[in-house]
Amino acid sequence: MEYGLLLLRLVVGLLFAGHGAQKLFGWFGGGGPQGTAAFFASLGYRRPAALAVVVGLSELGGGLLLASGFLTPLASFLLVTVMLNAIATVVWPKGFLGGYEFELTLATVAVALAATGPGEISLDDAVGWADELSGILWASLVLSSAIVISVITTTLGRGTAELDEIPG
């Protein structure tokens, strides 16, 4: 089971980290901060440049935390929040198949890892936190907090974008 959790954390965590690097640095064919901010502006976010940095850091930092199994509930919270926002603002209109099933799967994996913990091959376990930072309470806290932040972000954070804030 430990190797399965390690594989799951590495694949999902590094996938998120790669997407964060796309947003922050333009690596791997990403748009960088300017392209990401322009995309967020097209979705109606009021502070697209700031959001580009926050989302990029959430994906990069959360992905690396998840991959290493360190502060797993925090990693899960960051990643679930990003996925719920993506579902609500980008892929929901496309429906389940060909729409939001990928983002929902990633969010579910992150919540599940908050519940199970990162496993014995993790930094949380190495420092003795794995048992304290896992369980249904942590998974519930991750999911409920991510829902609250996502609702706030998608409702109060959208309106007329400050286009002059987009870098470049």
Where are these regions (language model features)?
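Non-catalytic alpha-helical scaffold/packing segments enriched in small hydrophobic residues
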Residues: 35, 39, 56, 80-83
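Alpha-helix boundary/capping detector
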Residues: 33, 46, 65-67, 110-111
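Residue-level signal for alpha-helical context at structural boundaries
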Residues: 38-39, 54, 95, 102
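Membrane-interface interhelical connector segments
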Residues: 26-51
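Generic signal for short, ordered secondary-structure residues
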Residues: 18-19, 40, 63
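Extended, low-polarity transmembrane helix blocks
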Residues: 1-28, 49, 71-168
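Physicochemical signature of membrane-embedded alpha-helices that form the seven-helix bundle of GPCRs
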Residues: 51-54, 58, 78
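Hydrophobic, membrane-inserted alpha-helices
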Residues: 57-66, 82-86
